Amino acid sequence: LTCLICPEKYCNKVHTCRNGENICFKRFYEGNLLGKRYPRGCAATCPEAKPREIVECCSTDKCNH
């Protein structure tokens, strides 16, 4: 699996996930509390969202754009 790994809105930095990491995630905040930041990466399980945070998980290559 390959996931995007940069926090900018338009990201093209691709990372090959390690064994056991079969999920790509992207997190962002309701109301843009941190400005336009979208932390992304690989995970074994979908990360839990913090208050006012939205986490999207998917399992195909580069799906976390």
From Swiss-Prot:
GO terms assigned for molecular function: toxin activity
Chief site of localization: secreted
Compartments (UniProt record): Secreted
InterPro entries for this protein: Snake_3FTx, Snake_toxin-like_sf, Snake_toxin_con_site, Toxin_cobra-type
SS bond list: 3-24, 6-11, 17-42, 46-57, 58-63
Tissue expression: Expressed by the venom gland.
SUPFAM superfamilies the record matches: Snake toxin-like (SSF57302)
A Pfam family: Toxin_cobra-type
Miscellaneous field: The geographical location for this forest cobra population was Rhodesia.
Similarity remark: Belongs to the three-finger toxin family. Ancestral subfamily. Orphan group II sub-subfamily.
Stated name of the protein: Weak toxin S4C11
Source organism: Naja melanoleuca (Forest cobra)
